[in-house]
Regions:
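Short acidic-hydrophobic, aromatic-tinged amphipathic segments that line or gate anion-handling sites
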Residues: 74-75, 158, 179, 270-274, ...
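Active-site and donor-binding regions of nucleotide-sugar-utilizing enzymes
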Residues: 16-22, 27-34, 41, 61, ...
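A nucleotide-sugar donor-handling region in carbohydrate enzymes
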Residues: 2-7, 51-56, 75, 152-225, ...
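Donor-nucleotide binding loops and adjacent catalytic segments primarily
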Residues: 51, 59-61, 196-286, 391
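Glycine-rich phosphate-binding loop signature in dinucleotide/nucleotide-binding domains
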Residues: 13-14, 95-102, 206-207, 286, ...
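A donor-sugar binding/catalytic signature common to diverse glycosyltransferases
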Residues: 106-107, 113-116, 128-129, 156, ...
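C-terminal amphipathic helix plus adjacent low-complexity
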Residues: 350-391
Length: 391
């Protein structure tokens, strides 16, 4: 763990000094256009906790999304979860003490977001994107992180009115809660030319509309024996029923779990290292069926419906923190048990065949989220200092 940050400093160019902390692939993706805009208007430093340290889960996305490397790498991953969380808090505290930023921006519900605890102790205004998301499932570690970070953040930036209501139910100040919408449409629009130009189908010898795309990495799906067995039994049956390749974008932890379990996958199931942003989205656009536990699935489905490239989207979870996408019929919440998953897959395929695609989710369609975030940070840093910290 890195604890000495005396080699890092802001430019001190008279602009607001903003620290952005990330640690995982979803944060990098969602924040990519926001980071670019913040670098344009603020004195900005990007710090990476190291939570995802594999290149295919991290570095490849900096390249694809045309992001400059992070100025700070905390190397906070420990021997176990407790050590990692402790390191994130300790390292971020040292970093903030050294840098003395005017504000902190974080997104989501990862362990890296717990760096907000350090900012709170140091009276640094905290801006939290993706605030108010709730799936109401206390078994998920992300749900705990959401509650912690929402409560201690000074300004919460929600994706939807659903999320704003959840924040209000927690008693959080309405005057410091804003609905910005999801940043994903802006990210997808900025990368759409590269996505469409990807030659990933040729490289992987796949034919559009004749393969199933699978992404499964969540703790509840991989680490729970019953769910793991049910999920991959269903995957084998999908490969058999439709007699087509199932391309599995397989995280290192998931691959290790499969190897240790000895579970035999159908020979049509192809394990592949995690794909880059452009390649994965091209695969989604062109798939016969997408089966995923990714948090970005509802937003990507909504965007491609609006673009005229809908794909059958099945979410392998029992709960969702994105009810607004269910409101518009953008995906099917399938559950994890074998029977439900197979039925959901069949239904999704038939819906597309019949031209029933759902509707774009309004909360996911704004393409100026980065502008909103810049304005709110600039306007409310001083407000928080005055109203909360009495500076």
């Amino acid at each position: 763990m890195k604890t000495d940050y005396t080699d890092i400093s802001f430019a001190n160019n008279g602009k607001l000094k903003l620290l952005i902390i990330v640690g995982t692939r979803p944060e990098i993706i969602r924040l990519s256009e926001v980071i670019k805009k913040c670098r344009l208007y603020f004195d900005c430093i990007l710090a990476h906790t190291g939570q995802n340290y594999d290149y295919n889960l991290n570095g490849i996305f900096f390249r694809d999304l045309k992001l400059d490397d992070a100025e700070v790498y905390m190397d906070a991953v420990g021997a176990d979860l407790g050590e990692t969380v402790g390191n994130i808090i300790a390292a971020s505290y040292k970093l903030m003490t050294s840098l003395k930023p005017d504000a902190l921006l974080i997104l989501g519900d990862t362990n890296s977001c717990l760096s907000a605890i350090s900012a709170k102790r140091l009276h640094i205004p905290i801006f939290h994107m993706e605030a108010g998301n709730r799936c109401k499932d206390e078994c998920l570690p992300e749900e705990t992180n959401r509650r912690i970070v929402d409560i201690i953040s000074d300004v919460n930036l929600a994706y939807s009115e659903h999320a704003r209501r959840y924040l209000a139910e927690c008693g959080l100040p309405k005057e410091r809660t804003y609905v910005t919408g999801s940043p994903m449409a802006e990210v997808l629009r900025a990368n759409l030319t590269e996505i469409k130009a990807s030659d990933v189908l040729t490289r992987l010898k796949l034919e559009a509309g004749k393969y199933i795309l699978l992404s499964a990495h969540r703790e509840e799906n991989i680490d729970t024996e019953e769910n793991f067995t049910s999920l991959f039994t269903a995957v084998n049956k999908l490969a058999e029923k439709y007699n087509m390749p199932v391309l599995y974008s397989c995280h290192p932890r998931s691959r290790k779990r499969l190897e240790e379990s000895g579970f035999k996958l159908d020979n049509r199931v192809i394990q592949h290292e995690p794909l880059g942003f452009h390649d994965y989205n091209k695969l989604q656009m062109s798939a016969f069926l997408v089966v995923s536990d990714s948090g970005t699935l509802p937003e990507e489905s909504s965007f491609y419906i609006s673009e005229g490239s809908p794909f059958p989207a099945v979410c392998i979870r029992t709960s969702t923190e994105r009810p607004e996408a269910l409101d518009k019929g953008d995906f099917i919440l399938a559950g994890i048990d074998e029977k439900s998953l197979l039925q959901a897959a069949d239904t999704a395929v038939m819906l597309k065949k019949n031209g029933d695609f759902g509707l774009p989710t309004p909360a996911y369609m704004d393409e100026n989220v980065s502008d909103k975030v810049v304005r709110i940070i600039q306007g409310y840093t001083g407000v928080v200092n005055k109203m909360v910290w009495r500076k």
